[in-house]
Amino acid sequence: MPEINASNLDEKQVQLLAEMCILIDENDNKIGADTKKNCHLNENIDKGLIHRAFSVFLFNTENKLLLQQRSDAKITFPGCFTNSCCSHPLNNPGELEENDAMGVKRAAQRRLKAELGIPLEEVDLNEMNYLTRIYYKAQSDGIWGEHEIDYILFLRKNVTLNPDPNEIKSYCYVSKEELKEILKKEARGEIKLTPWFKIIADAFLFKWWDNLNHLSPFVDHEKIHRM
């Protein structure tokens, strides 16, 4: 395995590697906890380590989707464009609650504040729509990767943004047509997308986006989409 040289990594992002993520099996049953670092090392992923995660898709009242470009300081997928917010619930009582994915929603509220500066009071947990779950695995480089079951959360409202530059390099709201152009740029190798965002955009996103006012037919809390 390639050596990890922490001196090459951002200090703040290294501190976050100590956070305790939720270990799960392939059916999203909690089986333990481990550090964010251990969860994202390819050597552990290759042994089957899986953790719980979430992806927020935040739309404004014009039905435009907030995209972010991950900062160059990020340890996994730096500089990649992705959906509004992507992270992990932590192994604590508030974020472990599984009823209506309330634990994941609390984690999303926390990270929307940490990454995008959205005030907590602007993110009502009851306004988040938990649609479904996606299981995937992807390498970032020779050392780091992802292996997770990703809870898909939709939220539509206008919010106050004050992004943390250590987390986010840039951001923008896009229409469906603008996102299609971004996907074409990615296909030409002009920009990079995170693997989970590309999976979701290719397989599900536009269908969901077309039905923002009627998402209930797409809610499936039983199935885990294995991509």
From Swiss-Prot:
Modified residues (N6-acetyllysine): K176
GO cellular component: cytoplasm; peroxisome
Keyword Aminoacyl-tRNA synthetase among UniProt keywords: no
Localization in the cell: Peroxisome
Enzyme active site: C86, E148
Keyword vocabulary terms for this entry: Acetylation, Cholesterol biosynthesis, Cholesterol metabolism, Isomerase, Isoprene biosynthesis, Lipid biosynthesis, Lipid metabolism, Magnesium, Metal-binding, Peroxisome, Steroid biosynthesis, Steroid metabolism, Sterol biosynthesis, Sterol metabolism
Sample GO molecular function, one term: isopentenyl-diphosphate delta-isomerase activity
Pathway named in the protein's UniProt entry: Isoprenoid biosynthesis; dimethylallyl diphosphate biosynthesis; dimethylallyl diphosphate from isopentenyl diphosphate: step 1/1
Motif (Microbody targeting signal): 225-227
Pfam families cross-referenced by the UniProt entry: NUDIX (PF00293)
Subunit structure: Monomer.
UniProt protein name: Isopentenyl-diphosphate Delta-isomerase 1
Source organism (scientific name): Rattus norvegicus (Rat)
Gene expressing this chain: Idi1
